[in-house]
């Protein structure tokens, strides 16, 4: 099974966490699911640089104060995901969705109200435990 290495940003602002919703996808298990923004680590790229690049591409925003949180391993039906999560803050205040269909800022205790991608659930639980 193919393994994909990705990074995810837990962006916080005023006690709330940024959540983004994927668009419709042929793979039902990720279609319209909520997730933390991020994406694939490219060959030769370190994780922090990958996350900064992905947030620029997906949200047209800059992040800083990256702090490693945890790594999640999750097997979907046709690939294995290794996801490295970092907490961070926005350097710029504006977000423009480039790839997602919706976004919400939620307090940690309200995160479980959304329909999350399975790989993000351990992050969700960790954030809710910290609140």
Tell me the role of every PLM-derived stretch:
Residues 62, 72-94:
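Active-site-adjacent beta-strand/loop module that shapes the phosphate/pyrophosphate-binding cleft
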Residues 16-57:
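Conserved Nudix-box catalytic region and its N-terminal flanking loop in Nudix hydrolases
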């Amino acid at each position: 099974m193919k393994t994909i290495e990705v990074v995810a940003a837990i962006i916080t602002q005023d006690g709330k966490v940024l959540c983004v919703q994927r668009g419709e996808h042929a793979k039902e298990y990720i279609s319209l699911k909520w997730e933390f923004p991020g994406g694939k680590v490219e060959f030769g790229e370190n994780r922090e640089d990958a996350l900064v690049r992905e947030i620029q591409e997906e949200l047209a925003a800059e992040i800083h104060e990256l702090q490693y949180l945890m790594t999640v391993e999750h097997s979907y039906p046709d690939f294995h995901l290794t996801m490295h999560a970092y907490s961070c803050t926005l350097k710029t205040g504006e977000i423009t969705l480039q790839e997602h269909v919706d976004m919400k800022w939620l307090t940690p205790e309200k995160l479980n109200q959304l329909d999350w991608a399975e790989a993000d659930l351990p992050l969700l639980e960790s954030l809710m435990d910290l609140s």
